[in-house]
Every structure is written in structure tokens, then in C-alpha cells.
Amino acid sequence: MKVIIAGGREKDGLIYGYTLQEMWVILRDYMHELRYHGPGRRSRTYVEEVISGCATGIDSLGEQWADCNWIPIKQVPADWKLGKSAGIKRNILMGDYAKSTGQGALVALHDGVSPGTKHMIGYATKIGLKVHVHLVKAKTE
């Protein structure tokens, strides 16, 4: 199945207050759980391709995860010449691409606040993708 991996962006080397290394561990462990255990034996997620929005942060960690697992990556960068709607349009393109083979999924690491990730979750739900949201409590110092 084609799987979008999305979430917050990196700012000053942090995502939701966590280092890239800490977020890598969260993503890696969550993907392992989905692929090999899932909420039930029949619901394990077979990942044939990872879809990335090419943003720094969770998107780039998703690409690294795909590389480490020998999984092809489909990059769908935002066309910022379109202005502020570029991120939303990219999310729609990613969702439609994931759905194009009949099955698709979204894995979102979300703090519950990020508007781009919130939109991706809503759109993926609307078009019938399997949606897996891992809520990440923002870490404050």
C-alpha cells in the first residue's frame, strides 16, 4: 500500500520540541508497530511506497525510514509559486496519489495543533485512506 508519512516541521533542529534523533525513534517504533503488529493480525500495514511532501521534519524522517527499509519514495513537493495554498494543494495531491491504487494510508505524527498536518488528516479521512495518527505531546523545556 502507498503510505503518506507526514507531520510537523523542523525548527532550530527540533520537531515539537524533540531532537531529530528522538523523533526518528518515535517514527521508527511506530512504523514497526504498524508493519509487524498492527491493532490486529489482519490490519498489519504493508508499505510498498512512501509518499513524502518533502518538508523538513517528519516528511524527511519518513524518507530516511523508507531508505533504511528499501522502500521506494514518491516525492510530492509543494509548489510555493501558488502562494499560501501550496501546502493544502500538495496534501490533496498526496492523498489522491495514495488512493490511486484503491488502498492507501496516512501515518501522521501530530501535536494536535499543526494546521498542515490537521488538514492532511482530515483530507485522508474524507477520501477513505487508512489513517494512523500518533499524537506527540509537545516537549517543553
Can you describe what each PLM-predicted range is?
Residues K2-V3, G7-E141:
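Acidic/glycine-enriched connector segments
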